[in-house]
Amino acid sequence: MKVSAALLCLLLTAAILTTQVPAQPDALSALFTCCFTFNNKKIPLQRLESYRITSSHCPRKAVIFSTKLAKAICADPKEKWVQDYVKHLDQRTQTPKT
């Protein structure tokens, strides 16, 4: 009886672990989204919601802008317009809303 209870416990633990493992690679890939090409066109500033910088694990440093329609757009951080947009978005998030 004790052996069958221990076996059942072991099987349940294994089942729980195997259902959780496939979700981990997706979570990791979301953390390490890399850009391999850049958007060459200037994006209208009013369409942008936020930005983030790519991980240091990526081959190219990039800014990823998120639009209000939930699209991700890669941009070259060396471009002047990208730097201006980053400053503007930083100021927008620091300004308290009344």
Curated annotation (Swiss-Prot):
Stated family: Belongs to the intercrine beta (chemokine CC) family.
Keywords of the record: Chemotaxis, Cytokine, Disulfide bond, Inflammatory response, Pyrrolidone carboxylic acid, Secreted, Signal
* The UniProt record lists the keyword Disulfide bond: yes
> Corresponding gene?
CCL13
Q: One GO BP annotation here?
A: eosinophil chemotaxis
Q: Which GO terms describe its molecular function?
A: chemokine activity
Name the cystine pairs. C34-C58, C35-C74
Record's superkingdom? Eukaryota
* Listed InterPro entries: Chemokine_b/g/d, Chemokine_CC_CS, Chemokine_IL8-like_dom, Interleukin_8-like_sf
Task: Describe its function.
Answer: Chemotactic factor that attracts monocytes, lymphocytes, basophils and eosinophils, but not neutrophils. Signals through CCR2B and CCR3 receptors.
| GO-annotated cellular components | extracellular space
Q: Which residues carry this modification: Pyrrolidone carboxylic acid?
A: Q24
Residues crossing the lipid bilayer are none
Which named protein is this? C-C motif chemokine 13
Indicate where this protein resides in the cell. Answer: Secreted
Spell out the SUPFAM superfamilies in the cross-references: Interleukin 8-like chemokines (SSF54117)
Provide the leader sequence positions.
Answer: 1-23
